[in-house]
């Protein structure tokens, strides 16, 4: 293999190994997150609601407000408001 080919192969191998390490870390983090959800559930918190809160916290404030307004409009249209 030429020097250029060896360099490209080395870089490719480096990228693949980095991705593999990150995938392993990601897997470990997902297990940690799962444990935290289990702990919260064991304490009496509703995990579905916690997941919704986390999703909402990731959103921009304007997007959250828009989503809430649309939800309220749909609830009214379906006669679900009190």
From Swiss-Prot:
Pfam entry (one): GapR_DNA-bd
GO molecular function: DNA binding
Keywords, in A-Z order: Plasmid
Record flagged with keyword Magnesium: no
Source domain of life: Bacteria
Record keyword Manganese present: no
Family, similarity comment: Belongs to the UPF0335 family.
Name of the featured protein: UPF0335 protein pRhico085
Organism: Azospirillum brasilense
């Amino acid at each position: 293999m030429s020097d250029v080919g060896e360099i490209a192969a080395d870089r490719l191998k480096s990228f693949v190994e980095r991705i593999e390490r990150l995938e392993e870390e990601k897997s470990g983090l997902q297990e940690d997150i799962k444990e935290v959800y289990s702990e919260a559930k064991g304490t009496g918190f509703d995990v579905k609601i916690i997941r919704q809160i986390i999703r909402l916290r990731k959103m921009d404030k304007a997007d959250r407000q828009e989503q809430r307004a649309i939800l309220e409009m749909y609830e009214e249209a379906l006669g679900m408001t009190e």
